[in-house]
Amino acid sequence: MMSDQENENEHAKAFLGLAKCEEEVDAIEREVELYRLNKMKPVYEKRDAYIDEIAEFWKIVLSQHVSFANYIRASDFKYIDTIDKIKVEWLALESEMYDTRDFSITFHFHGIEGDFKEQQVTKVFQIKKGKDDQEDGILTSEPVPIEWPQSYDSINPDLIKDKRSPEGKKKYRQGMKTIFGWFRWTGLKPGKEFPHGDSLASLFSEEIYPFCVKYYAEAQRDLEDEEGESGLSADGDSEDDDGSLGEVDLPLSDEEPSSKKRKV
């Protein structure tokens, strides 16, 4: 019969063995994910070149993506529509120091004359341990500079002189909830920055970018169906269609994100 000390030693060996097995699992999972990312990289590059030849590709994808609309205020779509290039790159392909979940997103905005400057912006996202040392870590980022539209001057955090007054606080909150506020998101200031900024970043890296062709095809089918229905209704009743979303100016109260597909 084993003594208590011997039992403790056996348990310690078992736990040590389990820990080593978990390390092996993590290493294999990383190896598999790196293999997948390496195989997909040239395909994405070739696909992106074809996308560049299709007018308003990203406008159509983003306008018709319901989940994306849940994060975006209706008034922002005027500027979202100027995005003509999106590229996601996984940092682990560049260096072993990165987690396979670390990535960057690059946007090119063609701009709006007299209001919004043409520009390209890259935002990097990395997994880091949180204060409570979560096992999987949390997604974080660093603020990156982006030129805001002139029409947003009143809610641009950099231009609000008195952020402590009730009016200043209100405008600051409005600005931080715009898509431009998302470029300031860090993941380290809950309640004080763009809401659910990590989820929006993951939406780009896990859904919108990898499956953009599928979403584009679905959007095209939806638009064709709408055009067909419009043709039929034109011959019949002429009821008002209140299902579409137009541009909405920011009201004094916080504007809610859109949650429906838009007509392009």
Curated annotation (Swiss-Prot):
Example GO biological process term? nucleosome assembly
Q: Where is this region: Disordered?
A: 223-264
Which keywords label this protein?
Nucleus, Phosphoprotein, Protein transport, Transport
Annotated effect of mutating residue 19 to I: Mildly decreases RTT109 activity stimulation
Q: Does Cell inner membrane show up as a keyword for this record?
A: no
- Where is the protein localized? Nucleus
Task: Tell me a GO cellular component.
Answer: nucleus
Single GO MF descriptor: acetyltransferase activator activity
Carrying Phosphoserine, the residues are: 3
Null mutant phenotype: Decreases acetylation of histone H3 'Lys-9' and 'Lys-23'. Simultaneous disruption of GCN5 abolishes acetylation of histone H3 'Lys-9' and 'Lys-27'. Abnormal protein sorting to vacuole.
- Which miscellaneous remark does the UniProt record hold? Present with 3120 molecules/cell in log phase SD medium.
Per UniProt, subunit arrangement is: Homodimer. Homotetramer. Forms a complex with RTT109; consisting of a VPS75 dimer contacted by two RTT109 subunits. Interacts with RTT109; the interaction is direct. Interacts with ASF1. Interacts with histone H3/H4 heterodimers and heterotetramers via histone H3.
Say what the protein does: Histone chaperone which acts as a cofactor stimulating histone H3 acetylation by RTT109. Preferentially stimulates histone H3 'Lys-9' acetylation by RTT109. May also stimulate histone H3 'Lys-56' acetylation by RTT109. Assembles nucleosomes (in vitro).
Q: Which family does it belong to?
A: Belongs to the nucleosome assembly protein (NAP) family.
This protein's domain notes: The C-terminal part interacts with the N-terminal part of histone H3 and promotes acetylation of histone H3 'Lys-9'.
Question: By what name is this protein known?
Answer: Vacuolar protein sorting-associated protein 75
